[in-house]
């Protein structure tokens, strides 16, 4: 439906914001571009919209090349962070403005606006000016203006950034329901990984102008392609610990387990990734046990964040575990177990070691520790 081929965007100051991006988006898909500020995600979006000229590459929409066409001719509608509503116009006139410019007759405009207003539940606001609306109401009007055009493609440029946390959560749900109902292909830009995980059919993680990983929310969460993706997707961020592997034996904090899939691999410097929510306080089978020296406990209500250091590591690497809300003391030693299937291994360049299945047996030293 939308095909981006070797997209490059270099600005006049020489900064290359987008570096040869290739991306294919299917009809009706909801794609979220996510990454830190300055990673190039907004440049990709603005290039699709035609708000930025591209340096090289091609953009095809429904089989038609559009990168050499004016924005108005691309059949794309965009929703901005700042709503981009005309303050002197009523909500109705804001919704009708684009249709009037295209020469659509008044009766058709009225019918389209009535349908969109009902869908977005903004019927009672049609006579109001934007200044009389809340942030969430303005964002719904901005979405309505895009929907009423009946475009082939929706583009969302961080549309929820100006809203408070509660309203963001509500609007996320509204956008997802609306996109499912309309079935319009959508590309959404955000720096918020929660928005990415909850909204996307597929997530595109962008780093320094290049695509780091494309996958479903589950794929990006459970099989991050790199330490960058692993640290960006998931909250709290993944823990990273120094480890080594020798002929399949994984060594970490004085303990080791055998990974038969890696029996031909040896490296003195690898990174072991553990998600905070995968640290169990109860012994698990086919798991590795580590001990945490507690530094800080942050109560969150139903659970808590336990910050500390892994005992046995030479480095002073911080470690966070998400646990049930139980009484814990600073400098208490807390045993934690992590299922081997939930360990993530990365090489010295931060790239993921890929394997289809893990089956580890622990050494007697680890086993004896677990029995204490």
UniProtKB/Swiss-Prot annotation:
Keywords: ATP-binding, Cell inner membrane, Cell membrane, Membrane, Nucleotide-binding, Sugar transport, Translocase, Transport
Subcellular location as annotated: Cell inner membrane
Molecular function terms from GO: ABC-type glycerol-3-phosphate transporter activity; ATP binding; ATP hydrolysis activity
UniProt topology in membrane: Peripheral membrane protein
One biological process term in Gene Ontology: glycerol-3-phosphate transmembrane transport
Cellular compartments per GO CC: ATP-binding cassette (ABC) transporter complex, substrate-binding subunit-containing
The protein's Enzyme Commission number: 7.6.2.10
ABC transporter domain ranges (all copies): 2-233
EC primary class: translocase
Lineage: superkingdom: Bacteria
SUPFAM superfamilies the record matches: MOP-like, P-loop containing nucleoside triphosphate hydrolases
InterPro entries, per the entry: AAA+_ATPase, ABC_transporter-like_ATP-bd, ABC_transporter-like_CS, ABC_transpr_MalK-like, ABC_transpr_MalK/UgpC-like, Mo/tungstate-bd_C_term_dom, NA-bd_OB-fold, OB_MalK-like
Leader sequence residues: none
Reactions mediated catalytically: sn-glycerol 3-phosphate(out) + ATP + H2O = sn-glycerol 3-phosphate(in) + ADP + phosphate + H(+)
Residue sites binding ATP per the record: 35-42
Family under the similarity heading: Belongs to the ABC transporter superfamily. sn-glycerol-3-phosphate importer (TC 3.A.1.1.3) family.
Alphabetical list of PANTHER family matching this protein: MALTODEXTRIN IMPORT ATP-BINDING PROTEIN MSMX, SN-GLYCEROL-3-PHOSPHATE IMPORT ATP-BINDING PROTEIN UGPC
Purpose of the protein: Part of the ABC transporter complex UgpBAEC involved in sn-glycerol-3-phosphate (G3P) import. Responsible for energy coupling to the transport system.
Quaternary organization: The complex is composed of two ATP-binding proteins (UgpC), two transmembrane proteins (UgpA and UgpE) and a solute-binding protein (UgpB).
Protein name: sn-glycerol-3-phosphate import ATP-binding protein UgpC
């Amino acid at each position: 439906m939308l095909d981006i081929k070797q997209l490059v965007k270099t600005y006049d100051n020489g900064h290359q914001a987008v570096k040869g991006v290739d991306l294919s988006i299917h009809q009706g898909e909801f794609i979220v571009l996510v990454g830190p500020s300055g990673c190039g995600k907004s440049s990709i979006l603005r290039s699709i919209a035609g708000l930025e000229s591209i340096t090289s590459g091609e953009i095809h929409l429904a089989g038609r090349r559009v990168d050499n066409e004016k924005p108005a001719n691309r059949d794309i509608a965009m929703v901005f962070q700042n709503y981009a509503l005309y303050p002197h116009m009523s909500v109705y006139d804001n919704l009708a403005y684009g249709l009037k410019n295209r020469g659509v007759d008044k009766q058709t405009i009225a019918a389209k606006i009535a349908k969109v207003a009902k869908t977005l539940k903004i019927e009672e606001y049609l006579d109001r000016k934007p200044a009389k609306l809340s942030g969430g109401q303005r964002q719904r009007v901005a979405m309505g203006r895009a929907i009423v055009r009946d475009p082939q493609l929706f583009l969302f440029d961080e549309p929820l950034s100006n809203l408070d946390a509660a309203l963001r959560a509500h609007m996320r749900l509204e956008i997802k329901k609306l996109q499912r109902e309309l079935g319009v292909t959508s590309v959404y830009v955000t720096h918020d990984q929660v928005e990415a995980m909850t909204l996307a059919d597929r997530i595109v993680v962008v780093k320094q102008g290049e695509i780091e990983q494309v996958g479903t929310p589950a794929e990006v969460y459970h099989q991050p392609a790199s330490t960058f993706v692993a640290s960006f997707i998931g909250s709290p961020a993944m823990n990273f610990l120094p480890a080594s592997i020798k002929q399949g034996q994984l060594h970490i904090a004085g303990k080791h387990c055998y990974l038969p899939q890696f029996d031909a691999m040896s490296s003195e410097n690898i990174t072991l990734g553990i998600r905070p929510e995968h640290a169990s306080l109860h012994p698990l089978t086919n798991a590795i046990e580590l001990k945490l020296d507690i530094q800080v406990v942050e109560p969150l209500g139903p659970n808590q964040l336990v910050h500390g250091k892994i005992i046995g590591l030479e480095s002073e690497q911080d470690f966070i575990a998400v646990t049930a809300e139980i009484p814990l003391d600073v400098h208490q030693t807390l045993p934690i177990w992590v299922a081997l299937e939930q360990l993530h291994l990365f090489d010295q360049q931060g790239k993921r070691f890929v394997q289809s299945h893990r089956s580890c047996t622990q050494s007697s030293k680890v086993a004896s520790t677990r029995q204490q």
